[in-house]
């Protein structure tokens, strides 16, 4: 309902920037760094929740009555806070606390990191402290 809105601003349709097919013309692998609760920092190509590996795939979560499906292309940081909720920072600076879906809860299957040199590391979700995502070769904006 309306109580879920922080702000409503009406704008002309020609000023509305919606995601379109061409925004994903050249899909990329997820690339980033996983910091673990025991202090390790692991960088490489990532597979999130063991099934999302490309920037056009979606991070699913809920906040109150609002459901989010955010392309990983727009996700910059992910930080599990407890078994039910995760903090997420988007490329535009927006911060969300999401829960209610497997991607952002203790039911997440963990992260695979394909490191330079061929080493593959699996990190359980409960061991993840923080994840940073960026386009390969370019760290966060």
Q: What function would you assign to each model-found segment?
A:
Residues 1-141:
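Compositionally biased alpha-helical segments
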